Amino acid sequence: MKFVLLFGVFLVTLFSYSSAEMLDDFDQADEDELLSLIEKEEARAKECTPRFYDCSHDRHSCCRSELFKDVCTCFYPEGGDNEVCTCQQPKHLKYMEKAADKAKKFGGKIKKWFG
């Protein structure tokens, strides 16, 4: 009985050691893969298109404002046949940013009064 118990403990120890080595190998492979993905992402990053500039070349390249990303909006000017695309901020997001800015200022005043 003691022999079976010792043999079982030996097998459990051996199994845990081998699985720990396998996990270390997997973790190292994941870290290497993650680093290569980060390097590719940095290489892919480019300049954003400012507000009211042409974004027809890349409609997802508009810059971020304080809280929200601008949207590439396309339209046909009066009397024109070609489409014009510019980065713009939708009105509802503009109003939300103004409200957030006023709330920040009001919060600062309250903090100054009571803080």
UniProtKB/Swiss-Prot annotation:
Its main location: secreted. InterPro entries: Spider_toxin_CSTX_knottin, Spider_toxin_CSTX_Knottin_CS. PROSITE patterns: SPIDER_CSTX. The keyword Protease does not apply. It is found in: Secreted. Residues 21-44 form a propeptide. Keywords: Disulfide bond, Knottin, Secreted, Signal, Toxin. It comes from the Eukaryota. Disulfide bonds join C48-C63, C55-C72, C62-C87, C74-C85. Expressed by the venom gland. It comes from Lycosa singoriensis. Pfam families: Toxin_35. GO terms for molecular function: toxin activity. This is U3-lycotoxin-Ls1a. The presence of a 'disulfide through disulfide knot' structurally defines this protein as a knottin. Residues 1-20 form the signal peptide. Belongs to the neurotoxin 19 (CSTX) family. 01 subfamily. The keyword Secreted applies. GO terms for cellular component: extracellular region.
